[in-house]
Protein backbone atom coordinates (compact mmCIF):
# COMPACT_ATOMS: atom_id res chain seq x y z
CA UNK A 1 0.00 0.00 0.00
CA UNK A 2 1.33 3.43 -0.99
CA UNK A 3 0.28 6.61 0.81
CA UNK A 4 0.06 9.95 -0.98
CA UNK A 5 -0.47 13.31 0.67
CA UNK A 6 -3.46 15.36 -0.39
CA UNK A 7 -3.58 19.15 -0.19
CA UNK A 8 -6.28 21.72 0.40
CA UNK A 9 -6.58 25.04 -1.45
CA UNK A 10 -4.21 26.75 0.98
CA UNK A 11 -1.47 24.29 0.03
CA UNK A 12 -1.49 22.51 3.39
CA UNK A 13 -1.62 18.75 3.77
CA UNK A 14 -5.16 17.69 4.68
CA UNK A 15 -4.79 13.92 4.79
CA UNK A 16 -3.53 10.81 3.05
CA UNK A 17 -4.74 8.79 0.07
CA UNK A 18 -4.06 5.07 -0.19
CA UNK A 19 -3.07 3.43 -3.46
CA UNK A 20 -2.85 -0.36 -3.88
CA UNK A 21 0.48 -1.95 -4.76
CA UNK A 22 -1.14 -3.34 -7.92
CA UNK A 23 -1.29 0.21 -9.27
CA UNK A 24 2.53 0.23 -9.39
CA UNK A 25 2.92 -3.21 -10.97
CA UNK A 26 5.53 -3.44 -13.69
CA UNK A 27 4.41 -2.95 -17.27
CA UNK A 28 5.83 -3.11 -20.76
CA UNK A 29 7.46 0.09 -21.96
CA UNK A 30 6.88 -1.01 -25.54
CA UNK A 31 3.12 -1.10 -24.98
CA UNK A 32 3.27 2.51 -23.74
CA UNK A 33 5.18 3.55 -26.84
CA UNK A 34 2.71 1.73 -29.12
CA UNK A 35 -0.20 3.43 -27.37
CA UNK A 36 1.28 6.93 -27.68
CA UNK A 37 2.20 6.38 -31.34
CA UNK A 38 -1.35 5.17 -32.03
CA UNK A 39 -2.82 8.32 -30.45
CA UNK A 40 -0.66 10.52 -32.65
CA UNK A 41 -1.37 8.47 -35.78
CA UNK A 42 -5.12 8.56 -35.20
CA UNK A 43 -5.13 12.35 -35.17
CA UNK A 44 -4.68 12.20 -38.92
CA UNK A 45 -7.78 12.40 -41.08
CA UNK A 46 -6.56 9.76 -43.56
CA UNK A 47 -8.60 11.58 -46.22
CA UNK A 48 -5.84 12.80 -48.55
CA UNK A 49 -6.97 12.22 -52.13
CA UNK A 50 -5.59 13.25 -55.51
CA UNK A 51 -6.95 12.90 -59.05
CA UNK A 52 -5.15 10.83 -61.61
CA UNK A 53 -4.90 11.34 -65.33
CA UNK A 54 -8.28 9.76 -66.00
CA UNK A 55 -10.06 11.78 -63.29
CA UNK A 56 -9.09 15.40 -63.91
CA UNK A 57 -11.36 17.68 -65.91
CA UNK A 58 -9.67 18.54 -69.20
CA UNK A 59 -10.15 18.98 -72.93
CA UNK A 60 -9.65 15.98 -75.19
CA UNK A 61 -7.84 17.97 -77.89
CA UNK A 62 -4.16 17.62 -78.62
CA UNK A 63 -2.06 20.50 -77.25
CA UNK A 64 -0.53 20.98 -80.72
CA UNK A 65 -0.14 19.04 -83.94
CA UNK A 66 1.91 15.87 -84.02
CA UNK A 67 4.66 17.02 -86.38
CA UNK A 68 6.34 20.17 -87.55
CA UNK A 69 6.53 22.18 -84.32
CA UNK A 70 9.87 20.92 -83.07
CA UNK A 71 8.34 20.05 -79.71
CA UNK A 72 8.04 16.61 -78.22
CA UNK A 73 4.79 14.99 -79.25
CA UNK A 74 1.94 15.35 -76.76
CA UNK A 75 -1.44 13.67 -76.87
CA UNK A 76 -3.47 14.98 -73.92
CA UNK A 77 -3.61 17.98 -71.60
CA UNK A 78 -4.37 15.65 -68.69
CA UNK A 79 -0.85 14.24 -68.78
CA UNK A 80 1.04 14.81 -65.50
CA UNK A 81 3.69 17.02 -67.11
CA UNK A 82 1.10 19.73 -67.82
CA UNK A 83 -0.20 22.28 -65.33
CA UNK A 84 -3.57 21.01 -64.10
CA UNK A 85 -2.80 17.50 -65.24
CA UNK A 86 -3.26 14.31 -63.24
CA UNK A 87 -1.05 13.28 -60.32
CA UNK A 88 1.13 10.20 -60.69
CA UNK A 89 0.96 7.73 -57.79
CA UNK A 90 -0.82 10.27 -55.57
CA UNK A 91 -2.39 9.40 -52.19
CA UNK A 92 -5.77 7.69 -52.12
CA UNK A 93 -7.95 6.86 -49.07
CA UNK A 94 -8.02 3.18 -49.97
CA UNK A 95 -8.87 1.89 -46.49
CA UNK A 96 -9.24 2.96 -42.87
CA UNK A 97 -5.71 3.23 -41.50
CA UNK A 98 -6.61 4.06 -37.90
CA UNK A 99 -4.62 2.10 -35.35
CA UNK A 100 -6.63 0.12 -32.83
CA UNK A 101 -5.51 -0.33 -29.24
CA UNK A 102 -7.10 -2.95 -27.00
CA UNK A 103 -8.83 -1.65 -23.88
CA UNK A 104 -6.57 -3.68 -21.62
CA UNK A 105 -3.44 -2.37 -23.34
CA UNK A 106 -4.72 1.20 -23.17
CA UNK A 107 -5.50 0.99 -19.46
CA UNK A 108 -2.18 -0.67 -18.68
CA UNK A 109 -0.33 2.10 -20.53
CA UNK A 110 -2.23 4.86 -18.70
CA UNK A 111 -1.61 3.13 -15.34
CA UNK A 112 2.11 2.88 -16.04
CA UNK A 113 2.31 6.53 -17.10
CA UNK A 114 0.50 7.68 -13.95
CA UNK A 115 2.68 5.45 -11.76
CA UNK A 116 5.80 7.02 -13.27
CA UNK A 117 4.47 10.52 -12.53
CA UNK A 118 3.80 9.55 -8.91
CA UNK A 119 7.22 7.94 -8.46
CA UNK A 120 8.98 11.03 -9.83
CA UNK A 121 6.94 13.40 -7.66
CA UNK A 122 5.18 14.99 -10.62
CA UNK A 123 1.63 14.21 -9.44
CA UNK A 124 -0.10 15.78 -6.46
CA UNK A 125 -3.50 14.93 -5.05
CA UNK A 126 -5.86 17.81 -4.29
CA UNK A 127 -8.74 17.59 -1.87
CA UNK A 128 -12.14 17.41 -3.56
CA UNK A 129 -12.97 20.81 -2.08
CA UNK A 130 -10.24 22.38 -4.23
CA UNK A 131 -12.21 21.51 -7.35
CA UNK A 132 -15.72 22.06 -5.97
CA UNK A 133 -15.97 24.92 -3.49
CA UNK A 134 -12.55 26.57 -3.28
CA UNK A 135 -13.54 29.58 -5.40
CA UNK A 136 -16.74 31.62 -5.34
CA UNK A 137 -15.78 33.20 -8.66
CA UNK A 138 -13.04 32.64 -11.27
CA UNK A 139 -9.75 34.06 -9.93
CA UNK A 140 -6.56 33.31 -11.83
CA UNK A 141 -4.39 34.80 -9.08
CA UNK A 142 -5.79 32.35 -6.50
CA UNK A 143 -5.26 29.38 -8.82
CA UNK A 144 -1.63 30.40 -9.35
CA UNK A 145 -1.15 30.84 -5.60
CA UNK A 146 -2.46 27.30 -5.05
CA UNK A 147 0.12 25.87 -7.45
CA UNK A 148 2.94 27.76 -5.76
CA UNK A 149 1.82 26.77 -2.25
CA UNK A 150 1.86 23.10 -3.32
CA UNK A 151 5.36 23.53 -4.77
CA UNK A 152 4.14 22.60 -8.24
CA UNK A 153 6.41 23.70 -11.06
CA UNK A 154 4.31 26.20 -12.99
CA UNK A 155 4.92 24.62 -16.34
CA UNK A 156 2.85 22.12 -18.31
CA UNK A 157 0.33 21.48 -15.50
CA UNK A 158 -2.61 19.16 -16.20
CA UNK A 159 -5.70 19.34 -13.94
CA UNK A 160 -7.77 16.16 -13.65
CA UNK A 161 -11.16 16.11 -11.93
CA UNK A 162 -13.77 13.44 -11.30
CA UNK A 163 -16.82 13.21 -13.57
CA UNK A 164 -19.18 13.54 -10.60
CA UNK A 165 -18.27 17.21 -10.29
CA UNK A 166 -19.01 18.37 -13.83
CA UNK A 167 -20.35 21.94 -13.65
CA UNK A 168 -19.49 22.49 -10.00
CA UNK A 169 -15.80 22.97 -10.84
CA UNK A 170 -16.48 25.72 -13.38
CA UNK A 171 -14.83 28.45 -11.28
CA UNK A 172 -11.56 26.54 -11.01
CA UNK A 173 -11.61 25.56 -14.68
CA UNK A 174 -12.08 29.18 -15.73
CA UNK A 175 -9.38 30.29 -13.30
CA UNK A 176 -6.66 27.97 -14.63
CA UNK A 177 -7.39 28.18 -18.35
CA UNK A 178 -5.83 31.65 -18.54
CA UNK A 179 -2.53 30.46 -17.06
CA UNK A 180 0.27 29.80 -19.52
CA UNK A 181 1.56 27.17 -17.11
CA UNK A 182 -1.60 25.04 -17.41
CA UNK A 183 -1.67 22.48 -20.20
CA UNK A 184 -5.32 21.54 -19.83
CA UNK A 185 -8.29 20.59 -17.67
CA UNK A 186 -9.82 17.15 -18.09
CA UNK A 187 -11.86 14.50 -16.28
CA UNK A 188 -10.86 11.12 -14.91
CA UNK A 189 -12.66 8.88 -17.38
CA UNK A 190 -11.70 11.07 -20.34
CA UNK A 191 -8.01 11.18 -19.53
CA UNK A 192 -5.65 10.66 -22.43
CA UNK A 193 -2.31 8.90 -22.12
CA UNK A 194 -0.63 11.43 -24.39
CA UNK A 195 -1.75 14.29 -22.11
CA UNK A 196 -0.24 12.45 -19.14
CA UNK A 197 3.06 11.88 -20.93
CA UNK A 198 3.25 15.46 -22.23
CA UNK A 199 2.33 17.09 -18.91
CA UNK A 200 5.22 18.04 -16.65
CA UNK A 201 3.00 18.06 -13.55
CA UNK A 202 -0.46 16.71 -12.78
CA UNK A 203 -2.94 17.96 -10.19
CA UNK A 204 -5.62 15.32 -9.68
CA UNK A 205 -8.63 15.46 -7.39
CA UNK A 206 -9.12 12.74 -4.81
CA UNK A 207 -12.33 11.64 -6.54
CA UNK A 208 -10.64 11.43 -9.95
CA UNK A 209 -7.82 9.35 -8.49
CA UNK A 210 -10.33 6.93 -6.99
CA UNK A 211 -12.00 6.55 -10.39
CA UNK A 212 -8.66 5.97 -12.10
CA UNK A 213 -7.56 3.35 -9.58
CA UNK A 214 -10.90 1.57 -9.84
CA UNK A 215 -10.76 1.46 -13.64
CA UNK A 216 -7.07 0.76 -14.10
CA UNK A 217 -6.23 -1.70 -11.33
CA UNK A 218 -9.10 -4.03 -12.27
CA UNK A 219 -7.39 -4.76 -15.60
CA UNK A 220 -4.16 -5.65 -13.81
CA UNK A 221 -5.93 -8.41 -11.94
CA UNK A 222 -7.42 -9.93 -15.13
Curated annotation (Swiss-Prot):
Keyword match Amino-acid biosynthesis: no
Gene Ontology biological process terms from the UniProt entry: translation
Cellular compartments per GO CC: ribonucleoprotein complex; ribosome
Organism domain of life: Bacteria
Sample GO molecular function, one term: rRNA binding
Keywords: Ribonucleoprotein, Ribosomal protein, RNA-binding, rRNA-binding
Family: Belongs to the universal ribosomal protein uL4 family.
Protein's name in the database: Large ribosomal subunit protein uL4
Organism of this sequence: Chlamydia muridarum (strain MoPn / Nigg)
Gene: rplD
Amino acid sequence: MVLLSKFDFSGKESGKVELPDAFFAEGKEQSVKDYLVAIQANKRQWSACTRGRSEVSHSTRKPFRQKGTGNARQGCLAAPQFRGGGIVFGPKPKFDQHVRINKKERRAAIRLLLAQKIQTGKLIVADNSVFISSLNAPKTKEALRFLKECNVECRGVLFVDGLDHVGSNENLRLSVRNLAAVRGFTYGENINGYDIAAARNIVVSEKALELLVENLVSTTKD
